[in-house]
Amino acid sequence: MAKEGLGLEITELRLGLPDAEHQVSVVNKKNEKKRAFSEIDDGVGDENSSSGGGDRKMETNKSQVVGWPPVCSYRKKNSMNEGASKMYVKVSMDGAPFLRKIDLGLHKGYSDLALALDKLFGCYGMVEALKNADNSEHVPIYEDKDGDWMLVGDVPWEMFMESCKRLRIMKKSDAKGFGLQPKGSLKGFIESAAK
């Protein structure tokens, strides 16, 4: 700054953005056109204002400021509003290398769920597994809120929807080692849903 006449201003190290002196004058010109908050009105018919009606632009009110609220809390808030309509649970099947999600709220009973699982994994036999567990090679089980694994169909549908955290379709031989014995108890649920 002592050597202003030598042309070394370009290579001089200083705090701030490069060419900040030039930008300060540009920023000041932009700020001259801005109005203070107290000068802003609600846009209610002020035709005799000093700036004139034609120069003023109507500002659109945004419902949210960009970047606020944080994305996580925004998604959480929106998911709470839609919580009753969407009840996704993860579904895994023994032998399948992937997991799927299914919306329990779309299904009216165990028979609809069994048909959806048949379509989802491309294996046919879930309806038979729910009707007569002795003749099928797969057994559908679910994990409830307490972390206990139970057979699908042991409880009424509404209670199942409230307590189900995830579904698993096991091979019947593994289910016996797991401590679950298929009882064929869904026969009444399937027959009542079919009527």
From Swiss-Prot:
Keyword vocabulary terms for this entry: Auxin signaling pathway, Nucleus, Repressor, Transcription, Transcription regulation
Coiled coil: none
Cysteine-cysteine disulfides: none
Locus of motif EAR-like (transcriptional repression): 13-17
PB1 domain mapped to chain residues: 86-174
Factors inducing expression: By auxin.
The keyword Transcription regulation belongs to this UniProt entry's keyword annotation: yes
Family matches, as SUPFAM superfamilies: CAD & PB1 domains
Record's keyword annotation contains Transcription regulation: yes
A cellular component term, taken from the record's GO annotations: nucleus
Region (Disordered): 37-60
InterPro entries according to UniProt: AUX/IAA_dom (IPR033389), AUX_IAA (IPR003311), PB1-like (IPR053793)
A Pfam family that the UniProt record links to this protein: AUX_IAA
Main localisation: nucleus
Free-text note on domains in this protein's UniProt record: The N-terminal half of the protein contains two conserved domains I and II. Domain I includes a slightly degenerated ERF-associated amphiphilic repression (EAR) motif which seems to be involved in the activity of transcriptional repression. Domain II is required for the correct degradation of the protein through the SCF-mediated ubiquitin-proteasome pathway. Interactions between Aux/IAA proteins and auxin response factors (ARFs) occur through their C-terminal dimerization domains III and IV.
Subunit field text: Homodimers and heterodimers.
PANTHER family reported for this sequence: AUXIN-RESPONSIVE PROTEIN IAA17, AUXIN-RESPONSIVE PROTEIN IAA19
Main function: Aux/IAA proteins are short-lived transcriptional factors that function as repressors of early auxin response genes at low auxin concentrations. Repression is thought to result from the interaction with auxin response factors (ARFs), proteins that bind to the auxin-responsive promoter element (AuxRE). Formation of heterodimers with ARF proteins may alter their ability to modulate early auxin response genes expression.
Similarity-based family: Belongs to the Aux/IAA family.
Protein known as: Auxin-induced protein AUX22
Lineage: Eukaryota, Viridiplantae, Streptophyta, Embryophyta, Tracheophyta
